[in-house]
Amino acid sequence: MEKFLLTAPDGPPSDVERIKQESNYLRGTLKETMEDRITAGIPEDDNRLMKFHGSYLQDDRDLRAERQKQKLEPAYQFMIRVRTPGGVATPEQWLAMDELARKYANGTLKLTTRQAFQFHGVLKWNMKKTLQAINDALLTTLAACGDVNRNVMCNPNPYQSEVHAEVYEWAKRLSDHLLPQTRAYYEIWLDEEKVADTPDVEQEPIYGALYLPRKFKIGIAVPPSNDVDVFSQDLGFIAIVEHGKLAGFNVAIGGGMGMTHGDRTTYPQLAKVIGFCKPEQVIDVAEKVVTIQRDYGNRSVRKHARFKYTIDRLGLDAIKAELERRLGWELEEARPYRFEHNGDRYGWVEGVNGTWHFTLFIEGGRVKDTDDYPLMTGLREIAKVHTGDFRLTANQNLVIANVPSEKKEEMDALIQQYKLTDGKHYSALRRNSLACVALPTCGLAMAEAERYLPTLIDKIEEIVEENGLRDEEITIRMTGCPNGCARHVLGEIAFIGKSVGKYNMYLGAAFDGSRLGKLYRENIGEKEILSELRMLLSRYAKERFDGERFGDFVIRAGIVKEVTDGTNFHD
């Protein structure tokens, strides 16, 4: 085996590294800070640590100017993210999340692009009660954010239930294995008695006292569906099914969507397949990959700290060699697989063992009641009688899963009663849309996303109808900033917020999530967006080959250049 010399980059540690170093395994002064009733906010050092506990301090940006005028502090509130490996939740857990959303949050539930629940608008004084109730529901927020392994994604594919069940178990085991071991979470939120420190005991055998240089994301896909966007993950596992059984996983490393506007040294990148492992080797592979990033990731410049930059700096071959050295065995050659799409399949689908699954379209992943659409109430009533489970999808939708044949009629009646929709009366474009939260709660947002994309799609749908493309599946994604929470540049049409009402527009991503999009127009508003799409969709309708996807067409037609690797994304 070729020998490589790996080194971590030079440079002083970032301020976040100092905060972690001084935190005593994520404790900091959080306990005292949360008991302080003078302010609804918390100091920045504690806010950095709060992420590891699954929460961010935010403020309502719609109210910011008015509160400044009144000489009031910002309308501080917390976002709480709940870890649900593989997006699977029991009906009892759904009911608990529903109750907490109405009792302590803003009355809505957000289903995220990583198959987790999010609460918005939780006040500081309600944080402890909320986290204790989440714990009582046998869920946790620990490591839902922060420089650790985040929620492990897993394909909730209702077509392959037997394989899904097995793959889900591996997702859950991965999640459990990579959870931080510190007791800080339990002491601060769950009133666990602090055990006297014993210096000879390693509190974090995998992470160490400094945890990882940056967030780390893992996802498992089951072909032909790439709904988890496996190539966007730091570590992706592609399930290989042979003769109806799970043979193992192809291993892909080094994906990540985030970048910084105007900084060409930052870029999105897709994970690359480096080999195959058996199911029982998955935990070992994941742990060793995480420790490589722990040891060689950039702890000086956070915007260069993701695993993708570690790989591009040191070389894929060097990282693979180091992985195999740490494993003590070599990965097998990658096995053939084929992805066909990265969207959801809506409505009723028959599974195995006489069970059924209903995939519900939830625009923007926002579960709430409106005057004409009692979505939250309907799901609450379904959860009261449902004997299967709920599966949050990576596209912010929901599968009412494992409905026994004898209960399908009852479930269907509830779906009809509350007008719950599979989205089939919407355009295929809308059904394949994805948006991050953005304004008013996200502190990083430069423009609207979740609140604006449905309105923009209303106008794009007119163009789609004019060109006979209503049932043509095209993925469209919007984020309020370039960080990539909605995996923006994997949308065939993508918008990244630049300033209020202005977006960078990207085209040319692959429908199956295997190619990044390319910058097409910079800093444009709605009028220009619609003008460009009128021309593009008209050309697509007239000039496309039979079965040709929109993302493939714009490259063949010379409208944008193909992105072959993240390192030439800006070329």
UniProtKB/Swiss-Prot annotation:
Its EC number is 1.8.1.2. It is an enzyme of class 1 (oxidoreductase). This is Sulfite reductase [NADPH] hemoprotein beta-component. Its cofactor is siroheme; [4Fe-4S] cluster. HAMAP family: CysI. Pathway: Sulfur metabolism; hydrogen sulfide biosynthesis; hydrogen sulfide from sulfite (NADPH route): step 1/1. PANTHER family: SULFITE REDUCTASE [NADPH] SUBUNIT BETA (PTHR11493:SF47), SULFITE REDUCTASE [NADPH] SUBUNIT BETA-RELATED (PTHR11493). The keyword Metal-binding applies. Signal peptide: none annotated. [4Fe-4S] cluster binds at C436, C442, C481, C485. The gene is cysI. Binds 1 siroheme per subunit. Binds 1 [4Fe-4S] cluster per subunit. It holds the Pfam family NIR_SIR_ferr. InterPro entries: CysI (IPR011786), NiRdtase/SiRdtase_haem-b_fer (IPR005117), Nit/Sulf_reduc_fer-like_dom_sf (IPR036136), NO2/SO3_Rdtase_4Fe4S_dom (IPR006067), NO2/SO3_Rdtase_4Fe4S_prot (IPR045169), NO2/SO3_Rdtase_4Fe4S_sf (IPR045854), NO2/SO3_Rdtase_FeS/sirohaem_BS (IPR006066). GO terms for cellular component: sulfite reductase complex (NADPH). Component of the sulfite reductase complex that catalyzes the 6-electron reduction of sulfite to sulfide. This is one of several activities required for the biosynthesis of L-cysteine from sulfate. Alpha(8)-beta(8). The alpha component is a flavoprotein, the beta component is a hemoprotein. It catalyses: hydrogen sulfide + 3 NADP(+) + 3 H2O = sulfite + 3 NADPH + 4 H(+). GO terms for biological process: cysteine biosynthetic process; hydrogen sulfide biosynthetic process; sulfate assimilation. Belongs to the nitrite and sulfite reductase 4Fe-4S domain family. Siroheme binds at C485. One of its GO terms (molecular function) is sulfite reductase (NADPH) activity. Keywords: 4Fe-4S, Amino-acid biosynthesis, Cysteine biosynthesis, Heme, Iron, Iron-sulfur, Metal-binding, NADP, Oxidoreductase.
